[in-house]
Amino acid sequence: VLAAVAVTTAFTATAEAATPGQVTAGSGWKLISPDSVTSLSPGTYTIQFDSTAARTKLTPYLKLSAANTAKLTPGVKFVVSTTLQKRVTTGCQKARTIVASLEYRPLGKKGYSQGGACYSLADHSLWSGYVRIDTEWFYPKWFSTNASTNTYRIRNSTTHEFGHAIGLGHPNKDLNHDGKVADYECPLNKDKSRPLMCSPNGGMVTSAGAGNYTPLDIPGLKALVANYQYR
């Protein structure tokens, strides 16, 4: 039996335990929910594409996302395939696949994209996932009038959605204690950057850092691996 969960992203801690031993949140990171994906099962997850357009446009970005994720998840690999696979719109994708689509305003709102995941009800490990990327991200100067910055932001944004597809959530928190959890309200890294998974966006806007998880994100990925032993 499977269950699905989705996280929507716009681009314009005390730890919790899901089951004994599992950690689902910490300073600057959290999983989507302690009741959804709590671990990654060892082996390979394959990234496929919903269309030739998605494959052409998203392959270089998702290769970066996959590589940057895999180096932080020992025993769990993410491989980008050339295979075309229609995204399942009701229910879950095939086991151990993450399907990427390129759509104009997939949620009907300017700049909104989405990442989502399915998990096994038996042990809450990741079953499959998807990313739906807004074509507007690739319009000239969409994120910035600076071409390099624009590219860096696309890298960060794609990895952000990929993070949702494997179980990472937004780590936003009411830091100023005003009773509201606001956009960009996330703990900061030592270099003052926001976690990559911060909503609506975060990450390092540099040539070397773009598309990478920040130091605050990394414990979340490590938790997804470590939690599997406590399933």
Residue ranges of each PLM-predicted region?
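Bacterial N-terminal signal peptides
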Residues: 1-10
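Disordered inhibitory propeptide/activation segment of secreted metzincin zinc metalloprotease zymogens
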Residues: 11-57
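Surface-exposed patches in mature extracellular/periplasmic domains of secreted proteins
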Residues: 72-90, 170-178, 231
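Catalytic zinc-binding patch centered on the HExxH motif and its immediate surroundings
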Residues: 90-132, 182-184
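Short pre-active-site segment immediately N-terminal to the catalytic Zn-binding motif
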Residues: 136-158
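The catalytic-center signature of Zn2+-dependent metalloproteases
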Residues: 152, 156-216
